[in-house]
């Protein structure tokens, strides 16, 4: 290892990007600047004299040029125009990329100017290189691949003695092997990227300081419950390091600003011996703090902490961070299930598992849209399994009020424990001393990055398997030293746990492939009911997420499209990897064929798929919501998955192009803040309330009609809702059991003033899908007898009119273009599963888009108003289709 490497990464704020050699990259002490772009080339095509290549003035005109500060090799090549992701995604084109070119190291290079002078120091900071690299600066090697190892192991190098007016940085990145390197793998989520994610996927920065440098700023907030009535004790910390060979005295100052803060500086004078490091901390009490809440529960006020180190009256280093006042705790209940609490209130985790872009490209605007989609679906948490992304992610979640559940990933080097018998190789490549060091610095870096953010709910130091005792001590110490204050969870499964942390309290028993809606309510006996709605399900779902035709045509050719409905058991490239259990839609399609009937066309298949997807996600979230306060509570649910790394045929709540379809709106309905739901298993009506304070009298209107529109039953019941709970309101089994065919069940929840809080329509029969629990696998439970929804194929045609008018700009319907869409069923039969799509003047989908509701079913002669928000203002028409209506298009 190289002696000039500083052990801890210096994180801070105020990062700027500068380009060109004319002006210095950094301008003053405390300034951090990003290396703005890269020239890159395969090591097989450049000189072996890397030291020489790292000197200024080398001709790189024949190299690829990537105009971005962070990119894997493939990401860089796409940026440089060598590849186009629309072409890569199409059909099986990804399989035809020359993977061999990535079997050798690649070289990244950038030249920049600095202004060295006496008293100035320059620090080079890596934040994420996948997965190992040699670093050269101005002709000298400053790190080797043994030291700069691990995708998350940020390191800091003092380059002061090498800095000149003209400088060159060269990074040689080595090929990544997920089983042997600490990287960002995709397991069975999708095909692997051609380069296995190798490259500079996070920014490299140059920081200018004076004699004393500053480490990451952390903020510890201590507050008692009830948080609304207590002061907050805030401690701001940062490590100071003397970079000189002589003692230095410096002044440290911190300013905390925000509501109820005076803004006065807290000051200290400190003396450091040569090279000495010391933790500097300041404490202030905020008497009446503004509390940060998850979005569904309140506002997201943020405070700012700014720390400055000065030597002889001049700034030596400075940084600031935002933070929030909130309190997160957890406990493992009597059933060995983890339950979280936020600000003293039981917090049911409702969310999805995030998928990073296949080539690890970050887009803040796109992620913001994803967060807004999640909040529109009434989700409160996003799980990051080994995909911790960038500081911007946490800043966005802080601002929007979405909780984040980060942690290490499964199934590769991160979990290469002697007791892990589920890796792709055996015996596992267990960690050596260098691996433990890499893991340690990975945790140090990530803990420092995430610590101040109020959106961070927890950290999972394991996913499928728990870390061994040596690793867990490293992880726990790194988190503790960073000032970590939220729960540390051993793993996302119940396979085992380290004594230091205790049980993780999360289950990972599937399903990952299709199961029927009643699965979630079939909770007894719980020891045999796997993923049903009890406990904390860390990753589970019916595997649905079928894109609509407009999206499918962007990545499938005609033969691929035909396979969807003509070859239901065929392996499909746009599913999982070719070695996984999820490489086809066989299980899903069996359910579709048996329940809805063999499709007669691609359009028919896709409509039936959207009905399958809608009922699947709705039932999952309703089941967990209804049983949140059951005798064995359903404490958390993470749908597998939220989104995909590329255009995929499954495992998403909206597709790669941000088009929301059946799985999205099933989730949105099933997760409503106040909701009324049908328990398929017991044929009961349940009331769900995810709010903190919304209570009082509620009316539930229950109506059951047959396929001809004839009323079978009608009931009105009044209940008193309970905040943050789910409870049974009534039993309708006697009505359901009388059915002779498919019927429609409409549930409407209203408040005392008659305002509709939730409207929900089901297609039901007197039977339910019969699950064969004894034959369950780790990824699904088979169905021994399917319900029969094929009578839906004989529905009489309904006539529906569609009109549009100026929008109401309802909360939750963002966009520059908001309209009201009024649907009216002018028939005596129900209009079933009406889908609406906002398109532009050319007929292309407008994405992202917000709908107050979609895929709706109308009673005979019912009128329903929906709101639509077109985000970019390009909406021109609305396309309407459904199970038993004629497809039409109306002008917006």
Curated annotation (Swiss-Prot):
What is the role of this chain? Hydrolyzes chitosan and chitooligosaccharides with retention of anomeric configuration. Has no activity against beta-D-galactoside, beta-D-glucuronide, beta-D-mannoside, chitin, glycol chitosan, cellulose, N,N'-diacetylchitibiose and pNP-GlcNAc.
Keywords on this record? Carbohydrate metabolism, Chitin degradation, Glycoprotein, Glycosidase, Hydrolase, Polysaccharide degradation, Secreted, Signal
Reaction equations catalysed: Hydrolysis of chitosan or chitosan oligosaccharides to remove successive D-glucosamine residues from the non-reducing termini
User: Family, per the entry?
Assistant: Belongs to the glycosyl hydrolase 2 family.
Q: What induces it?
A: By growth on GlcN or GlcNAc.
Please cite one Gene Ontology biological process associated with this protein: chitin catabolic process
Supply the source organism for this entry.
Answer: Hypocrea jecorina
Keyword Hydrolase in the entry? The reply is: yes
- GO MF annotation: an example: exo-1,4-beta-D-glucosaminidase activity
User: According to the UniProt record heading this chain, what is the dependence of activity on pH?
Assistant: Optimum pH is 4.0. Stable between pH 6.0 and 9.0.
Gene3D superfamilies, alphabetized? Galactose-binding domain-like (2.60.120.260), Glycosidases (3.20.20.80), Immunoglobulins (2.60.40.10)
- Main localization of the protein described in the UniProt heading: secreted
Q: Where does the protein end up?
A: Secreted, Extracellular space
Taking the record's annotation, the residue ranges forming a coiled coil are none
Provide one Gene Ontology cellular component. Answer: extracellular region
Question: What InterPro entries does its record include?
Answer: Beta-gal/glucu_dom_sf (IPR036156), Beta-mannosidase-like_N2 (IPR054593), EBDG/EBM (IPR043534), Galactose-bd-like_sf (IPR008979), Glyco_hydro_2_Ig-like (IPR006102), Glycoside_hydrolase_SF (IPR017853), Ig-like_fold (IPR013783), Ig_GlcNase (IPR041351)
Q: Which domain of life is it from?
A: Eukaryota
Q: How does it assemble?
A: Monomer.
- Which E.C. number(s) belong to this protein? 3.2.1.165
Glycan attachment points: 196, 336, 440, 557, 578, 689, 825
* Active-site residue list: 464 (proton donor), 539 (nucleophile)
Q: List the protein's name.
A: Exo-beta-D-glucosaminidase
Q: So which residues are the signal peptide here?
A: 1-18
Cite a single Pfam family from the UniProt record. Answer: Glyco_hydro_2
* Propeptide residues per the UniProt entry: 19-28
Q: How does activity depend on temperature?
A: Optimum temperature is 50 degrees Celsius. Stable below 50 degrees Celsius.
